[in-house]
Amino acid sequence: MARIAGVNLPTNKRVIIALTYIHGIGRKTAVDIADKLGIDHGRRVQDLSDAEVLQIRETIDADHTVEGDLRRNTAMNIKRLMDLACYRGLRHRKGLPVRGQRTHTNARTRKGKAKPIAGKKK
């Protein structure tokens, strides 16, 4: 089992799919990495040599922000918005949609489960 960026890649999956298990690497980035290193898209992780795994690891470390660093950067960006007290920061702080979606109805994912209001009936 190959371990890249602190993630154990599933051995029975194709390299492109397995790389997407790493937070911060999607399909396009995985394809770009494979093309850069000359790895066939149909190869499985179990068929990779140790040298190829090392190449993938070095490429990801050098060119991409993944896993903990990416999560930390995202959290810091949100915290910065909240500290600035700008509109987006206030929406994050209140747990409401940030990008202009309506909240009179819907927005249940962001707001959480509906809270019953005592004495309100139709």
Swiss-Prot record:
Against InterPro entries, the record matches this protein to: Rbsml_uS13_C, Ribosomal_uS13, Ribosomal_uS13-like_H2TH, Ribosomal_uS13_bac-type, Ribosomal_uS13_CS
Q: Does Isomerase show up as a keyword for this record?
A: no
Q: Which GO terms describe its biological process?
A: translation
A single GO molecular function, which one? tRNA binding
Output the Gene Ontology cellular-component terms. cytosol; small ribosomal subunit
For this protein, the record's SUPFAM superfamilies field holds: S13-like H2TH domain
Q: Where is this region: Disordered?
A: 95-122
Q: Which UniProt keywords apply?
A: Ribonucleoprotein, Ribosomal protein, RNA-binding, rRNA-binding, tRNA-binding
- Pfam families reported in the protein's UniProt record: Ribosomal_S13
Q: What does this protein do?
A: Located at the top of the head of the 30S subunit, it contacts several helices of the 16S rRNA. In the 70S ribosome it contacts the 23S rRNA (bridge B1a) and protein L5 of the 50S subunit (bridge B1b), connecting the 2 subunits; these bridges are implicated in subunit movement. Contacts the tRNAs in the A and P-sites.
| Subunit-level organization | Part of the 30S ribosomal subunit. Forms a loose heterodimer with protein S19. Forms two bridges to the 50S subunit in the 70S ribosome.
**Which family does the record claim for this protein?**
Belongs to the universal ribosomal protein uS13 family.
- Quote the protein name from its UniProt record: Small ribosomal subunit protein uS13
Identify the species of origin: Sphingopyxis alaskensis (strain DSM 13593 / LMG 18877 / RB2256) (Sphingomonas alaskensis)
Gene symbol here is: rpsM
